[in-house]
A protein has these predicted regions:
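Glycine-rich loop(s) and the adjacent beta-strand/alpha-helix scaffold that form part
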Residues: 110-185, 389-392, 398-401, 405
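Active-site- and interface-proximal helix/loop "cap" or "latch" segments in soluble metabolic
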Residues: 442-494
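Glycine-rich phosphate/pyrophosphate-binding beta-alpha loops
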Residues: 176-181, 220-223, 343-349, 377-392, ...
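A glycine-rich dinucleotide-binding beta-alpha-beta segment and adjacent secondary-structure elements
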Residues: 91, 289-381, 478-481
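Helix-rich C-terminal "cap"/substrate-channel and partner-interaction subdomain
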Residues: 232-335, 402-405, 409-439
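Conserved redox-cofactor binding core of oxidoreductases
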Residues: 4-111, 132-133, 181-182, 294, ...
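Catalytic phosphate/nucleotide-handling subdomain of diverse soluble enzymes
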Residues: 362, 366-410, 414
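An anion/pyrophosphate-binding glycine-rich loop and adjacent beta-alpha core
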Residues: 158-160, 167-285
Length: 494
């Protein structure tokens, strides 16, 4: 599968280039001037291989990919494409020849819709990073992970394919990479928002008040898996005013400036105290442990000796690992700060098995006629951890391969569906009692007036205005959004 990805991705980039990518401004390597760069949000890799174009209209688009999508979908070649919104796919159905060419769905009015394909059904339903029950079932500490992506990524598409005999590797379902930088925005939900204070001398402690990893480790996987093993998968980044100042001076304060600084949206998450004991009390962790942890850390800063986790405290550490260690400081000063962060998931790596044409395979390795899959609902390609950049190009490449094969291949006849394995079970999709019912009693009249709120949309902030008249919601207007218009326009208009 990786060989197929490598062989196809140049053509995929060329396809994007021919459809408008050539008109964009790219980040470039200062040393070479080439468009391929390193992506700093991922662990550094050996060869610059990432393209980072900027949207031509940043007021409407967060990423060039969405702008290109709007451009491509507006061309004559795609005029016949219909997108059905507010319609939920429920079941795949095979015909008497064993061909999976039927999808049963439910529309917004609760009516059953039957879709009949001529040659193929392509499943591009995503993974299960939005399903806490599934993550809990397959990952040891999955119940503690924050959902960092769309709640629509519930894994049900994978379950639908399982029900027509698709093979699912249970081990690969446990491949749920996390990021040790999740800010909890709502119960069980979060966004990537590291403090980066550890770059300039900050430390991270667990619920017991102890450090558990080398915060400056260039191997991000080591830090990710270490947090997964901590109580409640939570860490507290501990830092001081001097560390904040150095982080800003060294241009390492992107998250602090955007999220946590005074006046920023998550500033309320910053816990401040005049002593470590008071800080520990506010965090609900043992004060004696935190004080002992900081004392030990400061002693290593003074001596310059590496600590038990391998963190180094010399100028050579800065010179040799500047991307992760920009300054060395003690934890001391008039004020002490903490930011709680949890393990957060934005993608999963388990799913159904396919061949290089995207054809879904059964438990015996045979092709299920007519059924294709691409993107995050396919499992076992990348292994246990994220390979930087594949989250974007993977779906593009394998989507093109699947679509090409679907157009060129007649589904085989005479196939018999295999008995589904019970890797994924129906109870993983059971809805919990909606706690919102106790918060919003819609049977009671609402207060008349106009209300406005800004929330996190899929592609950026979304401002919504609501008008209440005679105790009822009279109008809802999306005043500002950054969504991909070719996909979201119809839903936004409603």
């Amino acid at each position: 599968m990786i060989r197929a990805f490598v062989d196809e991705d140049v053509d995929a980039i060329q396809w994007l280039w021919d459809n408008g990518l050539s008109e964009y401004n790219f980040s470039s390597m200062k040393t070479t001037g080439k468009h391929t760069v390193f992506a700093p949000e991922h662990q550094l890799y050996s060869v610059a291989r990432t393209y980072k174009p900027s949207a031509n209209d940043p007021t409407r688009y967060k990423a060039a990919a969405h702008e290109i999508m709007d451009t491509v979908l507006a061309t004559d070649a795609y005029k016949g494409v219909t997108i059905d919104f507010n319609t939920t796919a429920n079941q795949l159905v095979a015909n008497e020849q064993g061909q999976v060419l039927t999808v049963l769905a439910t529309d917004e009015n609760g009516q059953t819709v039957r879709y009949e394909a001529k040659k193929a059904v392509i499943m591009a339903t995503g993974g299960y990073s939005g399903n806490a029950k599934m993550m809990s079932a397959f990952a040891k500490n999955g119940a503690n992970y924050l959902v960092g992506g769309s709640t629509a990524a519930d894994g049900y598409g994978i379950y639908m394919m399982q029900q027509v005999g698709a093979n699912i590797d249970p081990t690969a379902m446990s491949y749920i990479p996390t990021f040790p930088m999740g800010h909890e925005t709502a119960p069980g939900m979060g966004v990537i928002a590291s403090s980066y204070m550890w770059k300039a001398g900050g430390i991270s402690v667990n619920q017991e008040g102890f450090r558990f990893a080398n915060e400056n480790d260039a191997d991000v996987v080591a830090r990710e898996t270490a947090l997964e093993e901590q109580t409640n998968a939570i860490q507290y980044d501990i830092f001081t005013d001097k560390i904040i100042e150095d982080t800003e001076a060294l241009n390492a304060s992107v998250f602090w400036n955007f999220y946590y600084a005074p006046g920023k949206p998550y500033n309320s998450a910053v816990v401040c105290a005049d002593s470590l004991a008071v800080l520990a009390e506010k965090l609900g962790i043992p004060a004696a442990n935190l004080e002992a942890t900081v004392k030990s850390y400061n002693e290593h800063v003074e001596s310059g000796e590496p600590d038990e986790f391998g963190r180094e405290y010399t100028e050579d550490a800065i010179k040799n690992n500047s991307a992760y260690c920009a300054a060395i400081n003690k934890i001391e000063g008039e004020h002490y700060y903490a930011i709680p962060l949890k393990a957060l998931v934005v993608m999963t790596l388990g799913g159904v098995s396919t061949n290089t044409d995207g054809q879904v395979l059964d438990v015996d390795g045979a092709v299920i006629p007519g059924l294709y899959a691409a993107g995050e609902c396919v499992g076992g390609i990348w292994g246990r951890f994220v390979s930087g950049g594949t989250g974007v190009m993977g779906p593009i490449v394998f989507g093109r391969l699947a679509a090409r094969a679907a157009m060129e291949t007649e589904p085989a006849t005479g196939y018999t569906l295999k008995t589904p394995a019970a890797v994924i079970t129906e109870d993983m999709f059971a809805k919990d009692a909606d706690s919102a019912e106790s918060l919003f009693d819609m049977s009671q009249p609402l207060a008349d007036g106009e209300y406005e709120a800004t929330v996190d949309g899929q592609e950026g902030p979304m401002t919504v205005k609501v008008t209440v008249a005679e105790g009822k919601i009279a109008a809802v207007v999306v005043a500002e959004n950054h969504e991909t218009q070719a996909v979201a326009a119809a839903a936004l208009e409603k």
